[in-house]
């Protein structure tokens, strides 16, 4: 559910769909909290922080840190192009976070820019983490992903 949340709810739901990445035209009314237009970025950033905290084993509402996906990748000594994979993933999360921090409210970005280039560039940075999580991380851990939901789950 972790990768599914990141890819479908955070990346696609909060950014990609309103940006029109999947439909070809922007859908500003699909921005989260459309009528409270100034908080969409905060909601996105909160979700991204939760994803990164989970990745790093940071406990909710606490300074406690435990075992994590990052610590497992580190224990496996997982490298990508000679660099530590957990560091690359964290760096990508940070890059995406910084790009979103530089944006106006999502609704304003979409409604006032045609195309909303700055937000599309931020979306691209969010997207770059998907193959790192979905391909590199799960491959290193020798696990498979199945997003099919079956009866009896």
List the predicted regions and their residue ranges.
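Mature extracytoplasmic or organellar-lumen-exposed domains after removal of signal/transit peptides
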Residues: 1-153
């Amino acid at each position: 559910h972790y990768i599914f949340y990141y890819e479908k709810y955070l990346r696609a739901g909060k950014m990609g769909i309103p940006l029109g990445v999947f439909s070809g035209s922007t859908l500003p009314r699909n921005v989260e909290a459309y009528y409270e237009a100034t908080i969409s970025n905060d909601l996105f950033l909160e979700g991204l922080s939760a994803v990164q905290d989970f990745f790093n084993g940071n406990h909710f509402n606490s300074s406690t840190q435990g075992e994590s996906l990052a610590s497992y990748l580190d224990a496996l000594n997982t490298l990508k192009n000679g660099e530590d994979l957990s560091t690359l993933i964290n760096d990508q999360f940070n890059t995406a976070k910084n790009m979103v921090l530089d944006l106006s409210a999502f609704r304003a970005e979409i409604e006032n820019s045609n195309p909303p280039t700055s937000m599309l560039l931020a979306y691209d940075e969010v997207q770059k983490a998907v193959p790192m999580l979905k391909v590199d991380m799960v491959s290193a851990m020798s696990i498979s992903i199945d997003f099919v939901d079956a009866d009896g789950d």
